[in-house]
């Protein structure tokens, strides 16, 4: 769906940083209202929970009023006696929390029938014909995406509106980073899984491109990956972008789509599904070119293990092996895998890193990313650690579904994660949108006491965000803390005038770093949100890098030995930093 032109996320995020823009924003909202109008409609109640709404849209968008506390309703859009779209939506019964756009541009000035079936568990007991939704529904030429959320990050990717979770299908091509993501364009809670799409030239400033892969007869569109087919092995064109995703219908099967316009639009393969299994949780295909095998590999989650396949043409896949039954954490569902070859720091050796996202089962509850290091010959992955060893990529509560970009320049492995947790992702205190991605991170490997671990370093593109050095924290800042002279425990506190604070502690003797967000701001939206998270530092920390944004604090050891990501929701941004004596501090405002 294209909204206005391609809207720049950075523009809408930064309006309220410039007070003089306020008048312009108000004028813009007034102009937008002038382009919307109420919709004449006929409402026919077939039962207490079944309504037919007849209307003739005169403009592109039908704005659906949403009430988040209501139950889902199944909505079918019918044109010329054909169902052209099916979605689940929480239509407003009593009040409107926000509206979402239903694109009816192809059917302007044609009769459209909305067949709406409300679930029996709906909260409202009133007559469905009297729902607020029918009175508040509007037709509009444009959908206003001006930011209305105080907690929208200033330099993290977010959807303009709606719900987002897993990053999907990420690749780099012709100077552009492509990020697809699990997306609900019809509400700010999980539902209607679709692939949203954003692009960037610098991994920081993102442009929303629409929804190129939408649900179909095989089901909604769950997570997956994309590759650049440089040799036309699939027969879909040299340098075609080939996407793989899980079709989630009555069962979970794997499907393929290809793009000849650099991922802006996709054509689904007539032979879908390309891979099936009887396992209920069979999803999230990650495909990559294996130069050692001279073939393609695919890894996906199949219950409590990862299945590995190979192919010469991206369409016909041969099962090779399975990994994981006796390894790592099995307290939740395994999903969203990735598998890559990485150099080991300080050696001429390379090893394979297998990412396995798990929910629940994280070290502090809910979802998290565990990983395994070993060898892979294109057929079988062999983990070098003992089966009961569990390693975590990030020791915060809010780092999940981590995957990497295909075809990244300079053989880099750049990762993004969903910056939230399934324990409370649907309840965080925003409505226009929910969820952001982590900052981009480059991955590597290092050895500590005979074990190989993943190194996680903020991507170099973030350096371009640095503005002026400032004396105190801002709503968007990077804080560097030199810890080389610290032999005693070091406490770092971010706080504001409301006595809200995030307290971090580095224990050099124990080699641990912790973050306490129990008094960080709004926490009562979930019993699972208050937390103290603790990470091993694998030796002495030399420099701590903190990335602070409107709703997050991400902590890194400058050498990549430690990463911790936590959401926070202060009433006002933290503007005070207190650090134990002896630690040198530099703060950059991020522009």
Regions found by a protein language model. Give the residues of each.
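Bacterial N-terminal signal peptides
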Residues: 22-33
């Amino acid at each position: 769906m294209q909204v206005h032109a391609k809207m720049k996320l950075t523009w809408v995020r930064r309006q309220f940083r410039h007070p003089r823009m306020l008048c312009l924003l108000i004028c813009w909202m007034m102009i937008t209202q002038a382009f919307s109008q109420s919709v004449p409609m006929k409402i026919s109640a077939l039962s207490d929970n079944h309504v037919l709404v007849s209307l003739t849209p005169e403009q592109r968008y039908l704005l659906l009023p949403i009430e988040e506390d209501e139950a889902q309703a199944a909505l079918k859009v019918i044109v010329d006696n054909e169902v052209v779209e099916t979605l689940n939506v929480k239509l407003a019964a009593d009040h409107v929390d926000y509206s979402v756009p239903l694109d009816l541009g192809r059917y302007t000035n044609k009769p459209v029938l909305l067949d709406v079936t409300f679930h029996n568990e709906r909260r409202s007991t009133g007559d469905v014909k009297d729902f607020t939704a029918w009175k508040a529904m509007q037709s509009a030429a444009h959908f206003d995406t001006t930011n209305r959320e105080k907690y929208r990050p200033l330099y993290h990717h977010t959807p303009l509106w709606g719900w987002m979770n897993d990053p999907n299908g990420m690749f780099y091509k012709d100077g552009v980073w492509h990020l697809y993501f699990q997306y609900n364009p019809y509400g700010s809670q999980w539902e209607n899984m679709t692939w949203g799409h954003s692009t960037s030239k610098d991994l920081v400033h993102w442009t929303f491109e629409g929804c190129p892969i939408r649900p179909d007869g095989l089901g909604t569109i769950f997570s997956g990956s994309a590759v650049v087919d440089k040799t036309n092995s699939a027969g879909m064109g040299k340098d075609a972008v080939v996407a793989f995703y899980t079709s989630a219908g009555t069962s979970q099967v794997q499907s393929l789509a290809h793009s000849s316009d650099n991922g802006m639009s996709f054509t689904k393969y007539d032979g879908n599904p390309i891979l099936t299994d009887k396992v209920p949780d069979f999803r999230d295909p990650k495909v990559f070119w294996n130069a050692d095998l001279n073939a393609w590999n695919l890894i996906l989650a199949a219950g409590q293990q990862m299945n590995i396949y190979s192919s010469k043409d991206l369409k016909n896949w041969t099962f090779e092996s399975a990994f994981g039954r006796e390894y790592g954490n099995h307290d939740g569902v395994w999903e969203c895998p990735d598998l890559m070859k990485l150099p080991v720091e300080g050696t001429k050796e390379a090893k394979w890193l297998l990412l396995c996202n798990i929910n629940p089962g994280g070290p502090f509850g809910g979802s998290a990313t565990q990983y395994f290091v070993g060898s892979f010959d294109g057929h079988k992955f062999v983990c070098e650690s003992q089966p009961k060893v569990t390693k975590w990529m990030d020791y915060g509560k809010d780092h999940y579904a981590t995957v990497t970009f295909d075809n990244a320049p300079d053989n880099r492995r750049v990762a993004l994660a969903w910056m939230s947790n399934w324990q409370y992702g649907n309840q965080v205190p925003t409505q226009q949108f929910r969820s952001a991605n982590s900052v981009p991170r480059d991955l590597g490997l290092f050895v500590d006491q005979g074990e190989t671990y993943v190194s996680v370093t903020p991507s170099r593109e973030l350096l371009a965000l640095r503005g002026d050095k400032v004396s105190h924290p801002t709503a968007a800042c990077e804080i560097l803390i030199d810890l080389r002279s610290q032999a005693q425990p070091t406490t770092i506190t971010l706080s504001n005038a409301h006595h809200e604070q995030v307290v971090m502690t580095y224990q050099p003797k124990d080699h641990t770093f912790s973050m306490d967000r129990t008094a960080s701001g709004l926490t009562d939206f979930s019993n699972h949100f208050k937390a103290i998270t603790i990470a091993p530092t694998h030796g002495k920390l030399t420099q701590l890098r903190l990335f602070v944004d409107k709703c997050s604090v991400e902590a890194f050891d400058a050498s990549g030995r430690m990463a911790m990501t936590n959401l926070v929701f202060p009433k006002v941004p933290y503007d005070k930093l207190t650090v134990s004596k002896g630690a040198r501090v530099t703060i950059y405002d991020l522009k």
